[in-house]
């Protein structure tokens, strides 16, 4: 499907953005199936088009670069992965503190970690953490960066730094859980009124709340939400299946 769409769009200059998107999605699809050669070919197609559309398509250019880097990481072509990231970073302003810069730093940290260059990996993860710490809506990415940083310090035998980053990552994990708990509790009644007690959104929120309370050690509260979750889960999934067949 993706190759056919790409061939059609390739011959229509006005549809370049669509061609690039089809190539990008096709590359992701092949990557999920572990067909990295086909994935790389399509991601490179997307990358070449997005490169011609800079700076308007900068976000897409970086996304395609990171996807390609991930593939090279899986196939242990680390030099190619780092080269792709370096090219993407050059497209960003000096001193950039955006989400895309954070993604580049995290991706580079991952490649360096695979190469057992733990100090260099830690430096990249630290920079990513510094970005995500103050970037709105990035609490989960901040947690992930701290966890990765902790692994680097652990591998280097930096006991004090490893202990500190472990505590920081756990503190951030609990902050994320509290935020998710608050959001789901606030939306629960609205989900029930809109979708009903066997609606997937309502049931999913019940499950999330129960899981968070259990993680926090609040067993009684977890059970209070787990019981209606279990009673509504089967019906919700059955309704979803029926809708998919309609």
Give the residues covered by each predicted segment:
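Residue register of alpha-helical TPR repeats
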Residues: 20-21, 60-63, 103, 144, ...
